[in-house]
């Protein structure tokens, strides 16, 4: 059911599960769409997860106090920022690989003010159609190569560039909302 920020986020139970899977040689994954990442305890847990072998994708629009891609520390963490014409406030948490995958929609960013001083919630998603939609949305955001910027180990954001078909996640979702995607 519905869980408060202290239980779901700060205690980091879900990441601990993924760390255990990774240490057992199993595939382990976590994905997050947030506006900000500043909470030191969560950052420390993300680093521990990366060191254990958990693959972590993060879409963080704004403040981010974690440097990804540092060998031996955060090399399993990828962080991108997408800033487009729409101000987004959605938060998605994904834990687990394949059949173990769990999805949450949440109100909290990973900021101390949200995890300690505010009442925030994360709601599990049980409906398979909604799970599929959340994964599709997350995948589109990760494939954005127009507005996305990737945070590198040098602490700088660099344009995501590739030779693939141009993808602008916000424009994709806008068009999809109006049934313009073929």
Summary of predicted features, one role per range:
Residues 2-9:
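Short, small-residue-biased leader/transition segments that mark boundaries at the very start
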Residues 10-182:
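PLD/PLD-like phosphodiesterase catalytic module centered on the HKD motif
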């Amino acid at each position: 059911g519905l869980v408060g920020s202290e239980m779901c986020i700060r205690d980091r139970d879900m990441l601990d599960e993924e760390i255990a899977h990774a240490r057992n040689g199993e595939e382990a994954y976590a994905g997050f769409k947030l506006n900000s990442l500043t909470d030191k305890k969560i950052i420390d847990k993300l680093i521990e997860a990366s060191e254990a072998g958990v693959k972590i994708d993060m879409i963080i629009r704004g403040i981010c106090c974690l440097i990804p891609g540092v060998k031996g520390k955060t090399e399993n963490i990828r962080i991108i920022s997408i800033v487009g014409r729409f101000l987004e406030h959605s938060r998605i948490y994904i834990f687990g690989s394949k059949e173990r995958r769990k999805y949450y929609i949440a109100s909290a960013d990973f900021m101390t003010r949200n995890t300690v001083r505010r009442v925030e919630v994360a709601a599990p998603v049980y409906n398979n159609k909604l799970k599929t939609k959340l994964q599709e949305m997350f995948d589109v955001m990760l494939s954005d190569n127009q507005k996305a910027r990737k945070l590198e180990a040098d602490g700088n954001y660099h344009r995501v560039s590739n030779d693939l078909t141009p993808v602008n996640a916000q424009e994709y979702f806008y068009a999809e909302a109006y049934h313009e995607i073929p």
